[in-house]
């Protein structure tokens, strides 16, 4: 949406001077920013190593000298080892969860946040100036402030603050990208602006001249920022846990929108498969926070309450095990951080142990009293298992104290085994071994179960062969995604001085402004105005002075007496014409020209392959000989790019494209301005 402005209000001042956007924090201010700085440095090292590997592989294919081949193979082994080391360093940053947690949080298992995607600086100045001069026929030097604001806004988005202000900053830039696409990025022309983003998990760069890569990456970073906000919440309070659940649900909403909108992606961290796993993981963490809120004030020693907590814990463990299963499927396993999959596996075993511990407390400590609803408790016990233990019924378990104790000890034994598995998994991963709060919590819960078991242990326990059945999971939590409303805050188009976006866009090319002196005859200028922002000349009298001066029917008036009127309505322009009180007045008009954009012969994207990750996407076009009868090869659009040339580049992935016929998501990222809701804008 664009503000309606009166003439003279567009003074060309920098938006940063008007406090239009709040910049992100300095890259050296916070521990999280320091991690992001390290990530940027690692990305550069990975890029350098991949270039060396590509060069070595090319030399290996080109030479037949055995001595040179041996030297190249040796160098290639060093490069691959260095790449593996850098990948492990990047994985260590991805699992640096302690930096993102609340400062007073030492009794909760850390949550996993997503790291922000890193990018390289982009210089819009030259390309946009050329386009403004050529397409809009305006003096590009007058838009220095707007260009500086745009580059400042993009730079600020690299280090957003970890709060709602940071989200608003990213959202404002995302909306600006919609304006920029309509103003400066014609579908049939390459401006020469290259957007480079690094994969969040592997650090592999993806470079493309299409603004849709920028849009998708900003959406990913909005989701990542929500996860960092969620992990920062104070999980020792009910409000903090509710905020954490909401933050993770908002993150899944953004990722789900990204997944449904893009069928193919240039980097694997934004592929549908990876996004599906990330959504499952974040919903599991939201469920984890819901369970923590349920037991925050303690669990009453009441039969149904303990049973509810046990089944809820079993459900949390179950969803984490589902995430672990997804993470271990190819090719997700090769790209997701190993420490993440281990952490998810640890949580699955931990909550499985908690479920068995709660059931053991019910069976061992709880005594049936006369005031209890026996039928209700019997029904609850029967729903706890898929099948009752051999030789036992729900009524027997309730009334036979000895059988209840034996079954409770079996559950305690099962809980201890799950605790031991969780500890074993965490110690097998060197990264998780260094997370002190995780090791402390796992050890404390393990000792609690052991203590409870020792209190009821007898010398002949080895004769008790009763095995505890699996607990049926049950939850009242509804896993859902929250769709953030990106249009809730009014955003000013940085390049609004170019004129209303519905008219002054890449779809229409304009002539240079023509100065025309119009004169009244019998109180009439000899033409009629219509339209709104800007006004158009119609019903022009061919014999009037304005027509003699060169005014044409269909011209748009952009200036009256030196005052810009692109944003003025018909009545406002008429008032400006009448306000001078003179018989003659100078106006500036423009006319629509035919589009004559030429198709570039080739649009190249930097490619740097990385073993067992993915390759970058190249916008390749068939190289044909230039002949007099040659027709310009039509470049496939960013939205419809698919797999091509499989024999030549079997590992090349497809570009992001919009799903045709997908369900409507108008309430997800709605824009009041029709121009931003158009299909051409939304990827």
UniProtKB/Swiss-Prot annotation:
Where the record annotates domain BRO1, the positions are: 110-501
Coiled coil as UniProt keyword: yes
Keywords per UniProt:
Coiled coil, Cytoplasm
One GO term describing the cellular component: perinuclear region of cytoplasm
Q: InterPro entries recorded for this chain?
A: BRO1_dom (IPR004328), BRO1_sf (IPR038499), HR1_rho-bd (IPR011072), HR1_rpt_sf (IPR036274), PDZ (IPR001478), PDZ_sf (IPR036034), RHPN1_2 (IPR047138), RHPN2_BRO1 (IPR047902)
PDZ domain segment(s): 515-592
Q: Where in the cell is it found?
A: Cytoplasm, Perinuclear region
Report the SS bond pairs. Answer: none
Taking every annotated instance into account, which residue ranges of this chain make up the domain REM-1? 25-99
GO BP terms: namely: negative regulation of stress fiber assembly; signal transduction
Asked whether the UniProt record includes 4Fe-4S among its keywords, one would answer no
Chief subcellular location equals cytoplasm
The record's annotation in CDD domains points to: BRO1_Rhophilin_2 (cd09249), PDZ_rhophilin-like (cd06712)
The record's section on Pfam families has:
BRO1, HR1, PDZ
Q: How does it assemble?
A: Interacts with RhoA.
Instruction: Give the record's family classification.
Output: Belongs to the RHPN family.
What this chain does, per the entry, is described as: Binds specifically to GTP-Rho.
Q: What is this protein called?
A: Rhophilin-2-A
Native organism is Xenopus laevis
The gene for this chain is rhpn2-a
């Amino acid at each position: 949406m664009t503000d309606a402005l009166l003439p003279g209000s567009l003074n060309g001042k920098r938006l940063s001077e008007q406090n239009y956007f709040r910049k992100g924090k300095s890259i050296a201010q916070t521990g999280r920013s320091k991690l992001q700085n390290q990530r940027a440095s690692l990305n550069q090292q990975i890029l350098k190593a991949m270039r060396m590997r590509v060069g070595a592989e090319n030399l290996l294919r080109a030479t037949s000298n055995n001595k040179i081949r041996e030297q190249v193979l040796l160098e290639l082994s060093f490069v691959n080892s260095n790449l593996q080391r850098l990948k492990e360093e990047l994985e260590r940053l991805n699992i640096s969860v302690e930096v993102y947690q609340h400062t007073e949080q030492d009794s909760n298992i850390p949550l996993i946040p997503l790291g922000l995607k890193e990018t390289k600086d982009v210089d819009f100045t030259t390309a946009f100036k050329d386009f403004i001069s050529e397409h809009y026929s305006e003096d590009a030097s007058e838009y220095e402030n707007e260009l500086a604001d745009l580059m400042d806004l993009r730079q600020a988005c690299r280090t957003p603050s970890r709060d709602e202000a940071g989200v608003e900053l990213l959202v404002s830039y995302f909306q600006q990208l919609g304006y920029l696409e309509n103003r400066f990025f014609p579908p049939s022309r390459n401006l020469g602006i290259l957007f480079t983003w690094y994969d969040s998990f592997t650090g592999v760069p993806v470079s493309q001249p299409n603004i849709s890569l920028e849009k998708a990456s900003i959406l990913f970073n909005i989701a990542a920022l929500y996860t960092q906000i969620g992990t920062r919440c104070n999980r020792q309070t009910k409000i903090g846990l509710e905020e954490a659940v909401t933050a993770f649900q908002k993150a899944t909403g953004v990722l789900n929108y990204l997944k449904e909108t893009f069928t193919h992606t240039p980097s694997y961290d934004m592929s549908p498969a990876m996004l599906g796993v990330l959504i499952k993981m974040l919903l599991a963490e939201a469920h984890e926070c819901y369970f923590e809120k349920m037991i925050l004030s303690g669990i009453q020693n009441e039969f149904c309450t303990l049973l509810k907590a046990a089944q809820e814990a079993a459900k949390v463990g179950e969803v984490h095990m589902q995430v672990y299963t997804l993470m271990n499927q190819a090719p997700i396993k090769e790209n997701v951080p190993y420490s993440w999959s281990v952490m998810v596996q640890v949580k699955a075993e931990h909550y499985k142990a908690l479920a068995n511990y709660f059931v053991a407390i019910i069976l061992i400590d709880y005594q049936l009293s006369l005031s209890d609803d026996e039928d209700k408790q019997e029904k609850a016990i029967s729903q706890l298992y898929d099948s009752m233990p051999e030789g036992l019924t729900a009524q027997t378990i309730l009334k036979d104290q000895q059988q209840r104790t034996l079954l409770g000890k079996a559950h305690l034994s099962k809980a201890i085994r799950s605790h031991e598995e969780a500890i074993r998994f965490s110690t097998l991963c060197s990264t998780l071994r260094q997370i002190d709060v995780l090791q402390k919590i796992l050890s404390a819960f393990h000792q609690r179960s052991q203590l409870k078991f020792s209190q009821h242990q007898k010398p002949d326990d080895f004769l008790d062969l009763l095995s505890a059945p699996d607990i049926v999971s049950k939850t009242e939590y509804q896993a859902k995604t929250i769709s953030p409303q990106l249009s809730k805050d009014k955003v000013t188009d940085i390049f609004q001085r170019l004129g209303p976006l519905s008219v002054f866009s890449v779809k229409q090319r304009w002539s240079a402004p023509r100065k025309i002196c119009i004169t009244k005859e019998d109180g009439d200028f000899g033409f009629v105005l219509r339209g709104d922002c800007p006004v158009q000349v119609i019903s022009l009298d061919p014999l009037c002075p304005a027509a003699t001066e060169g005014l044409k029917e269909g011209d748009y008036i952009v200036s009256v007496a030196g005052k810009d009127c692109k944003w003025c309505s018909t009545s406002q322009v008429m008032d400006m014409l009448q306000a001078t009180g003179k018989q003659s007045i100078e106006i500036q008009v423009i006319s629509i020209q035919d589009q004559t954009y030429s198709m570039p012969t080739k649009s190249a994207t930097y490619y740097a392959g990385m073993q067992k990750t993915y390759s970058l996407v190249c916008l390749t076009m068939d190289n044909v000989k230039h002949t007099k009868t040659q027709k310009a090869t039509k470049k496939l659009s960013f939205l419809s790019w698919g797999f091509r040339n499989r024999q030549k580049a079997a590992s090349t992935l497809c570009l992001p494209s919009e799903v045709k016929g997908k369900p409507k998501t108008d309430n997800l990222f709605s824009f009041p301005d029709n121009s931003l809701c158009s299909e051409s804008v939304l990827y």
